[in-house]
Structure formats: structure tokens, C-alpha cells
A protein has these predicted regions:
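Substrate-binding cleft of secreted/luminal carbohydrate-active enzymes
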Residues: 423-473
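Aromatic-lined carbohydrate-binding surfaces of glycoside hydrolases
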Residues: 122-124, 128-131, 140-356, 362-372, ...
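Extended acidic/polar, glycine-enriched regions
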Residues: 38, 44-47, 96-156, 184
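Beta-sheet-dominated interaction scaffolds and their linkers
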Residues: 1-41
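Glycine-enriched alpha-helix->loop->beta-strand junction motifs that scaffold or abut catalytic
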Residues: 354-357, 373-380, 400-406, 438-441
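Surface-exposed binding patches on compact interaction domains or structured appendages
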Residues: 2-15, 43-110
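Catalytic domains of carbohydrate-active enzymes that cleave complex glycans
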Residues: 298-306, 310-330, 334-365, 455-557
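Active-site clefts of carbohydrate-active enzymes
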Residues: 399-428
Length: 557
């Protein structure tokens, strides 16, 4: 009736999973770990995951209730389907609901486990059946053995996760007022799992329509507004520009309280999209920056239109962050400049305001990286360009240092990515690849950006399903995590464990085991025509599990 299977398997529809059964699972002490439970039903059935006997509309129908018997902390979840670009339903959502009809056939459930006690513990799944007002009967039970090591998972997740936050999208999807109390309640709900996953960066949108709404005005299928709106409220009073920072400060405080504010990134000041299609309105400045201002003197809204006023606007932002003692962790973010010259005007302007400003780039175009001779701390480079550097096809500045950088993927490449169509092992591999590259972390442009409809297949010619988000908008403003996000989170903690092992055993010992899973950097190559990465990394759950167990045993000696 059930079997335990690896957490890295993605179910297609209600088909049986093509994988081996698990009887045992290894985990570090205090490590959250997971398996999936493959359930077979011979008919559509109402299923409860809690003690409460919830009923469908039909009333006291035949139902199943799951119960977990273990000294281990456990929680069981339903998994939900998402329609992928190939029009095939695939499991990706870890659902918050506690009861549901499950269809005839196979359904995967998600089981999370965590223990602070060393030893081999039984995790027994019991299934009870009842109908009408009859007493329950135990119809099936199965036990997984969880081996918990005496070695503890590192308390601090040092992985430098840098997922971009789209706060305006949350207001749209829940239809609440932008930057209202209700909006901030939802924002905090969504930031909590992000912080738990190792997020270190607080993103501040400080102009209007950054990224030009991802050029959503060009998309006529699944029409959606994807614009971001300024966290700051600029206004003119008695002829002077003034800024209301209340929403910005409130978001910073949320991030600080959650422990995800080691760095602040300012978006929308330079390197902003899009000159060609979303117009330049500043009279003597070539960046397509738009800052909407409420002129209280005339009771009208306008935009900043002169370089002088824009300079004053940026100066006040910088001064505010200095006053809040946040300047030393602040960086001005520019997204994918094609070359150094494209952002030189913006750099000159902000350096004129403060010469100690730190600028950060997400590098997609090799020409920029080859000609940039500044500090690259916390920069991020797309995977295919990193491979070019390693293969000698792209030079990097002498000041460049990959150890203080992150890497990223986006709509490209097609593999080693985190789409719904991607193998889940590719999300887990992020932590291991980051260790292989000897980098500090990983950046991605997505976390919670959604189309206006419930059809998540937006711009499939450009963005594969899942490219825009890692979590789903659940009811009551609470996110539902994806299988992809869970694997990414686990991989981040694996990275922290690998770094801990390195401090005790040496990098050579740890890297030798990691390479069995990731392969060598020299084996990686990128095909520009197919947008695919070739390499010797393995989609092998058992191999991945064995690395952690071997390292834990070495630490015991």
C-alpha cells in the first residue's frame, strides 16, 4: 500500500515512481531530513493526515487516517500537482492542507523528520480505515529506520543564499494594498522560510517599475502585471524633495529579525531595465530610472525628470542608510550589464554622491567581467560564463576572487537548474557545486514572482515553468513550499556541513568525496546552441547520502 522512496524523486501525474524503495535513512543530529511516501489507492479516497476527522461534503464516507509512531519529530504533508510546459502534471507543491481526496493510483506524500538523539529510530507509518460511525481499523503499517549520527548539523547555515524578493507580487496575488499592514503580514510569512533556507540579503526596490515589469507588456498570452513599486514614498513639500522611508524601514526590520540582513541590495538606481522599450525620462541621464513623486504643493503626481533632482533623491537614500548604521552592508545592485560602459554613467553619479559606495553586479555577459578591474566581492556570475573562465575562454580581473562571489542560473541553462521540469537532484546539487567551485553561495532572480492567473506557465518560450518562483501562494497569505525549494535548502545545509568538515579534515579529503557526486570542474562545458551544461555530475541519491555518512564517520575518529 505504501513504500518509502527518495526525496529527490518527482512524481509524474499519478504514475508509479521509477525508483527503488528505501528501508533506511541517515541523518545528522538535529538535521531536518525527508523521504517521500508513495501511496497506492484502488479508488478515489478521502485522506486525513491529523487526528481530527475532517469530512468531505458527502459526510461520513470511507476514509483513511495516517498516524506516525516515532520518538523522532515528524510531519507529513500532501504533495500537489503543477501543470508543466509540456502539459503534463508533475508534483512540486508541498501543500499546507491536512485532509484531501486522493485519486485512484499512486500519490506521493512528503515526510519530514528531525531528531536530537543519536541512534537508530523507527519511524512507523500506520494507516487506519473507517466508514460512517464505525470504529477505525488498522489496515497497514510500515517502518523506516532512521539512523541519527552523533555528529550534529552546524548550528549556523553559512551558505550565502541570495534569492531576489518581489514584494509587489505578493500584494497583487493576495489583492491587498501595497505596503499596508496586511501586505507586511504576508511579506513576513514569505520571508520566514527564505531566512530558514540561508538567505543573507535584504532587497530594497528604490525606484518604480524596476526591470520594466520583466517586459510583461510584450506578453499577450497569460497577460500579467509584473511591475515592482518603490518602497520609498517621495514627495515635494514647500518646493523641497523629501522621502518617507517608513515602508522601507519596516521591511528591513522584518529581515533583521529573521536573520536575513547581512547585506542590503538597492535595486533600481543603476543598471536598470529597459532603455529600449520602457523609455528614458531623465533629461540628462541615460538610465531608464523612474521615480514617481507626490507634489503636495500642486496636489499632483509627477516623476523625477532631472539629473539634479535624481542625485538629491539618491543622496537622501544613502544618508538614511548611514543614519540607520546600515551603510557598511549596503550595495547598489545592477543586473546583467552588457559592458562596463553601459553602467559607467550611473557609477559616476553615485560615486560623486559617496565615493565609498559599493556596487554589485549580476554578470551574464562575459565582456563585462573581462573588462572590469574593480572589487568583485559578493558579485554573482552566471554558470555558463563561470565555465568559460575555468576553460580559459574568458579572462577575469586580477582583483577578482571567486571565493567571495556567488554563481547563478536563470532562464538559462536548461539543466543544472531549478525548473519544474528539472530533476530535483539539480536543486540539491547547488550546495555541492558551490563547494566544488569554492564559492560562498548562490543567487537566483526568483522567489515569489507570479503571473496574474493560476496558470504558472508564463512565457514558456523564455521562462520554463518554475523559473519565476520557488514557493507557491497558499491560502491566508502563507506560502506553500516547492519540492525544488526544499532540496535547495537541504543542499545549502549540506554545504555548511561540508565547510565544517573541511575545517576538521581538510579540503582535499572533503573535495575527494564531493567530486564523486559533482564530477570535476574541468568536465563542465556549455553548448550555446542547446543551452545545456555537460558534465560528470550524477543524479544519484544513494551516492549523495553516502558522502554525508562517510564524512560523519571520519569526524568520529
Amino acid at each position: 500500500m505504501i513504500r518509502f522512496i527518495p526525496s529527490t524523486v518527482r512524481q509524474i501525474g499519478n504514475l508509479k515512481n521509477n525508483c527503488e524503495e528505501l528501508n533506511n535513512k541517515f541523518a545528522l543530529k538535529n538535521e531536518e531530513t525527508s523521504v517521500q511516501i508513495e501511496l497506492f489507492l484502488d479508488k478515489k479516497t478521502w485522506v486525513n493526515l491529523d487526528d481530527v476527522l475532517t469530512l468531505p461534503w458527502e459526510g461520513l464516507v470511507e476514509n483513511l487516517r495516517f498516524e506516525i509512531e516515532s520518538v523522532v519529530d515528524c510531519k507529513l504533508y500532501f504533495e500537489g500537482d503543477v501543470l508543466d510546459d509540456d502539459k503534463i502534471y508533475k508534483k512540486d507543491v508541498i501543500l499546507n492542507k491536512r485532509s484531501s481526496y486522493l485519486p485512484k493510483g499512486y500519490s506521493n506524500l512528503w515526510l519530514e523528520m528531525k531528531s536530537d538523539t543519536e541512534g537508530i529510530h523507527n519511524v512507523t507509518i500506520k494507516i487506519f480505515k473507517s466508514e460512517g460511525s464505525d470504529d477505525e481499523e488498522l489496515i497497514f503499517q510500515k517502518t523506516l529506520k532512521l539512523e541519527v549520527s552523533s555528529i550534529e548539523i552546524p548550528e549556523k547555515n553559512i551558505f550565502y543564499l541570495d534569492l531576489w524578493q518581489h514584494l509587489s507580487s505578493l500584494a497583487r496575488v493576495y489583492d491587498v494594498e501595497y505596503y499596508s499592514d496586511e501586505h507586511f503580514r504576508i511579506i513576513e510569512n514569505f520571508m520566514k522560510p527564505l531566512a530558514d533556507a540561508g538567505q543573507k540579503v535584504c532587497d530594497l526596490i528604490v525606484s518604480d517599475y524596476s526591470w520594466a515589469g520583466q517586459e510583461c507588456f510584450k506578453i499577450y498570452d497569460n497577460q500579467s502585471s509584473l511591475y515592482e513599486y518603490n518602497l520609498i514614498k517621495p514627495y515635494i513639500k514647500n518646493g523641497k524633495l523629501q522621502l518617507d522611508f517608513s515602508a522601507l524601514d519596516r521591511f528591513i526590520e522584518i529581515c533583521q529579525n529573521l536573520g536575513m540582513c547581512e547585506e542590503i541590495n538597492l535595486f533600481g538606481i543603476i543598471g536598470n531595465w529597459n532603455r529600449g522599450n520602457f523609455s528614458v525620462i531623465l533629461e540628462d541621464f541615460d538610465e531608464p530610472i523612474k521615480v514617481r513623486v507626490h507634489n503636495l504643493d500642486s496636489s499632483k503626481f509627477t516623476f523625477i525628470r532631472t539629473k539634479k533632482m535624481y542625485e538629491e533623491y539618491v543622496r537622501q537614500i544613502f544618508e538614511h542608510l548611514v543614519e540607520k548604521d546600515l551603510w557598511n552592508i549596503t550595495r547598489v545592485m545592477a543586473d546583467q550589464p552588457r559592458n562596463v560602459g553601459e553602467v559607467s554613467e550611473g557609477e559616476d553619479l553615485i560615486r560623486k554622491i559617496r565615493d565609498d559606495v559599493k556596487i554589485k553586479y549580476a554578470i551574464m555577459h562575459g565582456d563585462f567581467f573581462e573588462n572590469y578591474d574593480g572589487d568583485t566581492e559578493n558579485f554573482s556570475i552566471i554558470l555558463n560564463e563561470y565555465i568559460r573562465v575555468q576553460n580559459g575562454g574568458l579572462k577575469m580581473s586580477d582583483k577578482s576572487n571567486f571565493q567571495n562571489m556567488t554563481w547563478y542560473v536563470c532562464w538559462t541553462p536548461f539543466n543544472l537548474n531549478q525548473f519544474v521540469k528539472s530533476s530535483l537532484i539539480e536543486s540539491r546539487l547547488v550546495g555541492y557545486m558551490t563547494y566544488l567551485f569554492d564559492m560562498k553561495g548562490f543567487l537566483r532572480w526568483n522567489y515569489c514572482l507570479y503571473p496574474d492567473s493560476n496558470d504558472y506557465r508564463y512565457r514558456p518560450d523564455r521562462w520554463a515553468c518554475g523559473d519565476m518562483f520557488f514557493v507557491y501562494p497558499g491560502k491566508s497569505g502563507v506560502p506553500e513550499l516547492s519540492l525544488r525549494f526544499k532540496q535547495l535548502s537541504y543542499g545549502n545545509m549540506d554545504y555548511s556541513f561540508l565547510r565544517y568538515c573541511e575545517s576538521k579534515l581538510g579540503r582535499c579529503t572533503v573535495l575527494g568525496l564531493v567530486k564523486e557526486f559533482t564530477g570535476e570542474i574541468a568536465d563542465l562545458s556549455y553548448n550555446e546552441q542547446t543551452r545545456e551544461i555537460s558534465g560528470s555530475y550524477k543524479d544519484d541519491y544513494n551516492l549523495m547520502e553516502s558522502i554525508k555518512k562517510k564524512l560523519a564517520l571520519k569526524l568520529k575518529k
